[in-house]
């Protein structure tokens, strides 16, 4: 008996999250004997609760489906809705009644840690009530902090953007040789510094910028930082320093908190910003050289110009494999990437229990960080470099990229 499929996106978008959506939709269209309607949740599980859905097959009638693959952001819209911990909460029967009324047999959620938490809760509730709906998580996060997977879709393109921007910033900073300067680049990363570590890929030779890289995996020492900056300025007069937004001192206080109060989001996460500005002012006051801070901000996750072909292909494949896994009877699983080889780079796809993934964070390994805590080792470079390979040619019109727009 045919069943309907529904797919949604949640959390912060990436440049390739729609690649996974494209993979889910196109693979589902190939299985006409098992899958009938293909629905998209508008604004994730929260939108679905409010009855907001769309027919994904309608994209065939326009050029939207072909544009979807290379469109950044979340085509279906996102949410940060957290399902209750208590599986006896009335929201669960409400959701499953809606699933039943729409004939849903396959549920796909494309997202990061909190999204996998949603898949976990829904699959556990399904087991509790003996529902045969299959729940699959398709990973995405530029933070690259999901466990049980070599890396996550979205990280490769964001890493390519970060490394490209840092290389360009370093060139710009070096145009004047008669005045010392320090440029601080603040990069996304709350508790895991994978994206900031990727700034090391910008270097063309030993001793090239960025000379200093600080991750949240190690405690940030303000005085040691100032000493390092002074030392580096002797050999690198136009110094570039890359920091994660979540760097903190030995007591766990975020550097950005030293600059003032910060708010929290709906999941209780502190909204981190301002670490670069704080260090800019610190260097200006204590060392007295020309300073500038740059916050890469949302461009890290929405730049289509720096798409990694490797990342986009893997993102699409994650969606494809997700559909195949559900049709084989798997549920409560997340698609994972298994690296078979670095040179040449080889990858395979598997599934892992989402309950062992959600609410866990994968940090940059300590042996990939230098002993002084202000750089990464060659092991990280070997890990990250394959993920940024390949350029994606975007469809264009009048000199600008063409994207899919949900109306």
Please report, for each region that a protein language model flagged, where it lies by residue.
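N-terminal phosphate-binding or glycine-rich loops at protein starts, especially the Walker A/P-loop
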Residues: 1-53
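Gly-rich Lys/Arg/Thr-decorated short loops/hinges at beta-loop-alpha junctions or inter-strand turns
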Residues: 4-8, 68-81, 140-150, 179-181, ...
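Glycine-rich oxoanion-binding loops at beta->alpha junctions
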Residues: 51-105, 114, 142, 153, ...
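Accessory alpha-helical/coil subdomains and C-terminal extensions
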Residues: 98, 106-111, 117-130, 136, ...
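C-terminal non-catalytic interaction/assembly regions of soluble proteins
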Residues: 256-407
